[in-house]
């Protein structure tokens, strides 16, 4: 069974439905939240019920599509104070304001901005609501389908690049990799970005371990070297614990050998790992022209530690994450989250005697929030940090892996189209 962050039922074009997995309840509770309006999309994005730059863009675009579907019901439109449907020009103006509102849900993630920019173009070009709805529908379907295809390409590109580099170094042993936050099926339409590379590395390891004559499904080797990834170290990724709650959940689901580690243990884990750690693969919420990258808080320090130990550090993201208008990381607006998201820890209540989740009278796991810091203490809680391009060894995309020139700079112009 594949993991799904987004359920988009398009079997009936005139009656589509969207549900989003509430990732705040994982790993013990699986609950899908229906999306009917832009307000619903804003809420699940802003509260981080859905996260991951590609998934955020998809959910945002789907929320617009769902609101259009409701707008075409005259009764619904007349109940909304922000719409005047007496003319499409007035509706167009209101929709433009609604897109502004939706964009404010997570301003750092460039994928959402890019998707809404495409929708604005469609809005400007459409002669009426029906034409606009058809255009958005086609765009959303293409966005989802291309994301999944590109994720598999990225996974294989990043895995093959690392394996080839290790072969050129003469390294032919088992190895481990690091990752942070969640960049897998739960952050995308499927397979993942950085975690997609991990999936491809694991498939390669299975292929190299497959005995001749094995009757099981044949796996595909990504290169002819003997190096195999045998261990993944996901960081817990405080304060939202996406690594612990989500990435660990995906790795267990896919039966990929993994050991969850504290954010503060990176250096010591590298120094003491029973198998050598040869690379770190991370995702991105925004990559600017020079290669500086905004990603989950903690990515910068992971890159610094990798630099110290000589470990390859790769950013993995689709071309839609490239911001061709911003020159350097200094131009990225970093979102800051509410203090209580740092001072409180939320999760499923566990019975101290049995170690099992506590359940309510409907046999559903009970969620709880506990304080871990004085309520009076000041808090700085940035959602992202900026990793300088100098610390990045390669940027993995669906078009291949981009590395730095002899001068130490990235040339990403081929990705700006």
From Swiss-Prot:
The active site is at residue 285. It is found in: Cytoplasm; Nucleus. Pathway: Amino-acid biosynthesis; L-methionine biosynthesis via salvage pathway; L-methionine from S-methyl-5-thio-alpha-D-ribose 1-phosphate: step 1/6. It is an enzyme of class 5 (isomerase). GO terms for molecular function: S-methyl-5-thioribose-1-phosphate isomerase activity. It holds the Pfam family IF-2B. It catalyses: 5-(methylsulfanyl)-alpha-D-ribose 1-phosphate = 5-(methylsulfanyl)-D-ribulose 1-phosphate. GO terms for biological process: L-methionine salvage from methylthioadenosine. Disulfide bonds: none annotated. SUPFAM superfamilies: NagB/RpiA/CoA transferase-like. Keywords: Amino-acid biosynthesis, Cytoplasm, Isomerase, Methionine biosynthesis, Nucleus. The record marks 181 as: Transition state stabilizer. Coiled coil: none annotated. Catalyzes the interconversion of methylthioribose-1-phosphate (MTR-1-P) into methylthioribulose-1-phosphate (MTRu-1-P). Belongs to the eIF-2B alpha/beta/delta subunits family. MtnA subfamily. This is Methylthioribose-1-phosphate isomerase. It comes from Lachancea thermotolerans (strain ATCC 56472 / CBS 6340 / NRRL Y-8284) (Yeast).
């Amino acid at each position: 069974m594949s993991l799904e962050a987004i359920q988009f039922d398009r079997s009936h074009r005139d009656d589509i439905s969207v549900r989003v997995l509430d990732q705040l309840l994982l790993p013990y509770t699986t609950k899908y939240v229906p999306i009917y309006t832009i307000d619903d999309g804003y809420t699940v994005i802003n509260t981080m019920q859905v996260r991951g730059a590609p998934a955020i863009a998809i959910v945002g675009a789907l929320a617009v599509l769902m609101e259009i579907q409701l707008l075409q019901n005259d009764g619904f439109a007349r109940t909304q104070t922000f719409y005047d449907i007496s003319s499409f020009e007035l509706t167009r103006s209101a929709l433009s304001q609604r897109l502004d509102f939706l964009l404010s849900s997570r301003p750092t993630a460039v994928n959402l901005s890019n998707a809404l920019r495409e929708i604005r173009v469609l809005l400007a070009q459409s002669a009426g609501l029906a034409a606009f709805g058809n255009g958005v529908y086609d765009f959303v379907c293409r966005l989802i389908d291309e994301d999944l295809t590109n994720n598999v390409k990225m996974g294989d590109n990043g895995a093959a690049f690392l394996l080839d580099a290790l072969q050129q170094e003469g390294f032919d042993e088992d190895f481990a990799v690091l990752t942070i936050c969640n960049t897998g099926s739960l952050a995308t339409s499927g397979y993942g970005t950085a975690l997609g590379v991990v999936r491809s590395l694991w498939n390669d390891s299975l292929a190299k371990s497959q005995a001749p004559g094995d009757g099981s499904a044949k796996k595909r080797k990504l290169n002819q070297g003997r190096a195999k990834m045998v261990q993944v170290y996901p960081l817990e990724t405080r304060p939202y614990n996406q690594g612990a709650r989500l990435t660990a959940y995906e790795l267990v689901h896919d039966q990929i050998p993994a050991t969850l580690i504290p954010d503060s243990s990176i250096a010591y884990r590298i120094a003491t790992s029973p198998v050598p750690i040869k690379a770190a693969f991370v995702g991105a919420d925004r990559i600017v022209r020079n290669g500086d990258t905004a990603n989950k808080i903690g990515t910068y320090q992971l890159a610094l530690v990798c630099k110290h130990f000589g470990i390859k550090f790769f950013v993995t993201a689709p071309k839609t994450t490239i911001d061709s208008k911003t020159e350097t990381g200094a131009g990225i607006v970093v979102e800051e989250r509410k203090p209580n998201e740092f001072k409180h820890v939320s999760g499923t209540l566990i019975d101290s005697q049995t170690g099992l989740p506590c359940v309510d009278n409907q046999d559903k796991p009970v969620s709880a929030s506990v304080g871990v810091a004085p309520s009076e203490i000041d808090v700085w809680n940035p959602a992202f940090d900026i990793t300088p391009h100098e610390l990045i060894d390669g940027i993995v995309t669906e078009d291949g892996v981009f590395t730095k020139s002899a001068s130490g700079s990235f040339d990403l112009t081929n990705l700006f189209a």
